[in-house]
Structure formats: structure tokens, C-alpha cells
Design a protein with these regions (language model features):
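A charged N-terminal "starter" segment
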Residues: 1-107, 112, 381-387
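Glycine-rich tight-turn/loop motif centered on a GG-T
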Residues: 23-34, 118-124, 159-166, 201-208
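Conserved active-site and cofactor/substrate-binding residues in soluble primary-metabolism enzymes
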Residues: 33-40, 64, 68, 87, ...
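Aromatic/hydrophobic pocket-lining residues that form π-stacking "cages" and hydrophobic walls in ligand
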Residues: 45, 135, 214-217
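Active-site-proximal beta-alpha core segment in soluble small-molecule metabolic enzymes
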Residues: 57-188, 192-198
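Active-site loop/helix belt of alpha/beta enzymes
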Residues: 154-268
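Active-site loop ensemble at the mouth of alpha/beta enzyme cores that anchors a bound cofactor
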Residues: 237-317
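C-terminal accessory subdomain/extension
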Residues: 290-387
Length: 387
């Protein structure tokens, strides 16, 4: 999906990854991250967000819940980390990093609620009154006032399969009335997902019905004299979409893919955020005229289509196509069109969620100045690996 953008925006990353692979320093099934570029992307986002008065929570799941990288990004001015689930929150808290938002997309399990409250999570999203009561009880026990966000939806909204959740908008007044009765809770705001999506036909990011539902819910509360301080609208957050969010009065957003430049808007390599990671593999064998490279990092929603194959013998890079991958299979290997020498390196660049892969994550600094140096190795869940 992003091979052309990678070649255009960050050819130095390709060269660095291949050089480190040739030295035996990077194994197949590794996501190689250009640390300096991802920090530059983050800096640009923070600067843009400040121009429009929007706070940013840092989303880390796309780059493997990596605490080392998260700490560097937080130093740029992000308002904390949004933990997409309780396991990500655990990784970040163990690293001593601030989790600012928890409960969205995945609710906090009952026996983890108290810890989230006691650790000082800025806002906790709830989908049900039952979960709100659990948060209330934990807040009372901890002697704290816990801010919460309500996830809302309407019947015509777009919800990803497996993510169906929230309070239906027409019940919002009744829900808020119940929330107000719960001690230890402060209704801070509303959220929904996805609020923006890339439209291939239009060639740009557009608001979803979900964003309109979110705005209507805010206005509904305002008419009843209920003011909220946070209107959280995640999905497709980037330098080019932040002005659009500002037009709708959004106060908080949660960039993830834009940090690595792997947003659909960047397929041509023309966005402010530049490609900052690639996936490295290696040809294992041939079968019936095609080549098979080591798998482990394939993401079925990633729109992977093309790959660059590097032969050490002639130092030649050839572009080829990824053949159809059967969705019922385990990605032990990925099939590439044509025969290439065994043990050639393979470079992919596609939209991923590293935390659901088996990949290693290799952090490399100094790429843009021609002095690549590996500064960290982690697994896909943010655990440090031996050098």
C-alpha cells in the first residue's frame, strides 16, 4: 500500500534496513522504525494541533505498544497515552508512562477498574451504566473524582464488526441523569469511533455519520444546560485532518498511523507526515515458480500489494507483487510473484497493527544523517528483547 510512498519519502530507511540486514543485525519478520522520522512526524502533529486548540493523546498500538518510543513522543507535548485495552495500559504503566485515556476501544475489566482509577487516568470511557457504577465504586474507595467519557452512537452509524458498543443517542438524557447520581464521577465528555475515514473516491478524509452523531449528542446536552470539556473524535487524525476536526469543535484526537506516515491519505507520499517504518522479511524458498518469504507480520486489513526484493549478489532491487493470501491460513510464509534468489531480503510497507502480529520491532536512529544505529529491540507487545 505504501511502497511508492516509502520510496519517495524515505529511501534512506530502505537503505538502512537492507544494510543492517546484510550485517546480520535484523532478522526476518521485523518492523524497522525510523526513530528520527517518527519524532519529526509527532512534532508536526503537535504544532498543528496547537494551532487549532486540539489536545492529542498518543496511540501506541500501531507501533507495537513500544514504551521507549512512547516516552520520546510524550516529551514532544502529547497529553498522555490512550490505551486501547487494559493490556496496553499495563505495559505503559509498568514503564512509568502516563495513561491519560482508557476504556476505548476496549472497556476496563472489573478487577482492573480500581487500578485505572488509582493510577490517575485522566478520563475513562464507559459504554454501560454497569461499567460506570464500577468506576464510581472505585473512585469512592480511592477518594477521587474520576472523569468519564460516554461513547454514543446512532442506528445509522458505521461500527466496525466486533466493536459495536456505546449508548444510543436517543437515550442520552436518561443515561446522563443516572451518571449524575453516581458518586465520585464527573461527566467530562463524549466520544465515538471512527469519526473520520479516508474516502478513496473523493481522495480525501471525510467525516463519518459517527462524527455528526457526536456533535448532535454534544448539542443535545448543551440545550439541557450540560457543558462538557472534552469532545474526543478519534480515527484518521493527522496534520491535514486536524483543521477539519477543529471546524466541528473537537477538543481531543488520538493520532496513531499518522506517526508512522501510514495513513491512507499518504499513499502517494504527499502528506506532511513521512513514512517512518517498513517490514523486512527474507526469501525462504520457491514453489511452482513463485517465491515465499517468511511471514509473521502480515495484517489482513493492511492492503499489502507490492514488495521490494533485494539480492545481495548483484545488489539489485526488484519490485514484485504479493500474491493472494488465503484468509483462512496462518502467515507462516507470504507468496511473491516470480522466483528470486533464496535468502534475498524483502521489504514491504503497508498499514499494520503491530500489536496483533508476531513481529519484532527494531528502532533505528541516525538514518536521515546516514549513520543508522539500532537503539532498541522489542516484541510486538512492547517487551524488550535481548540485543
Amino acid at each position: 500500500m505504501f511502497v511508492e510512498a516509502l520510496k519517495r519519502q524515505n529511501p534512506a530507511l530502505i537503505s538502512a534496513a537492507l544494510s543492517l540486514w546484510q550485517q546480520g543485525k535484523i532478522a526476518p519478520d521485523s518492523w524497522v522504525i525510523d526513530v528520527d522520522q517518527i519524532l519529526e512526524n509527532g512534532k508536526r502533529q503537535i504544532e498543528t494541533a496547537r494551532l487549532y486548540g486540539i489536545e492529542l493523546y498518543l496511540m501506541t498500538k500501531q507501533f507495537g505498544r513500544n514504551p521507549w518510543l512512547a516516552e520520546k513522543l510524550l516529551a514532544l507535548g502529547y497529553s498522555g497515552i490512550v490505551a486501547v485495552d487494559y493490556k496496553e495500559a499495563r505495559v505503559m504503566r509498568r514503564a512509568g508512562l502516563p495513561v491519560a485515556h482508557q476504556g476505548h476501544l476496549v472497556q476496563i475489566p472489573c478487577h482492573q477498574v480500581a487500578d485505572a482509577v488509582e493510577q490517575g487516568t485522566d478520563v475513562i470511557t464507559v459504554f454501560t451504566l454497569d461499567k460506570a457504577r464500577e468506576v464510581s465504586a472505585a473512585a469512592v474507595k480511592a477518594g477521587r473524582i474520576q472523569s468519564v467519557l460516554l461513547k454514543v452512537y446512532s442506528d445509522d452509524d458505521f461500527l466496525y464488526p466486533g466493536q459495536e458498543s456505546g449508548f444510543v443517542q436517543h437515550s442520552l438524557h436518561e443515561v446522563v441523569a443516572e451518571i449524575k447520581k453516581l458518586p465520585g464521577l464527573h461527566l467530562a465528555g463524549l466520544t465515538h469511533f471512527p469519526c473520520l475515514l479516508w474516502d478513496e473516491a473523493a481522495g480525501k478524509v471525510l467525516p463519518t455519520p459517527n462524527l455528526h452523531t457526536l456533535i448532535q449528542a454534544r448539542d443535545q446536552l448543551a440545550k439541557s444546560g450540560i457543558a462538557i470539556e472534552q469532545l474526543n473524535a478519534p480515527s484518521a487524525t493527522s496534520c491535514t485532518s486536524l483543521p477539519l476536526l477543529a471546524q466541528y469543535g473537537v477538543t481531543h484526537a488520538e493520532p496513531g498511523h499518522a506517526l508512522t506516515g501510514t495513513i491512507p491519505a499518504n499513499q502517494q507520499g504527499d502528506q506532511p507526515e513521512r513514512i517512518a517504518m517498513l517490514w523486512l522479511s527474507e526469501i525462504s524458498h520457491h514453489f511452482r515458480g513463485d517465491s515465499y518469504c517468511y511471514g509473521g507480520g502480515y495484517y489482513r486489513r493492511g492492503h499489502a500489494q507490492h514488495a521490494l526484493v533485494f539480492s545481495p549478489e548483484n545488489q539489485k532491487i526488484t519490485e514484485t507483487n504479493l500474491k493472494t493470501v488465503d484468509d483462512s491460513s496462518i502467515d507462516y510464509y507470504l507468496p511473491l510473484a516470480g522466483e528470486f534468489p533464496v535468502s534475498s531480503a524483502v521489504v514491504f510497507c503497508f498499514r499494520t497493527q503491530i500489536f496483533v502480529t508476531r513481529s519484532d520491532v527494531v528502532l533505528v536512529s541516525g538514518i536521515q544523517r546516514g549513520e543508522p544505529e539500532i537503539v532498541g529491540r522489542y516484541d510486538s507487545l512492547g517487551n524488550s528483547l535481548e540485543a
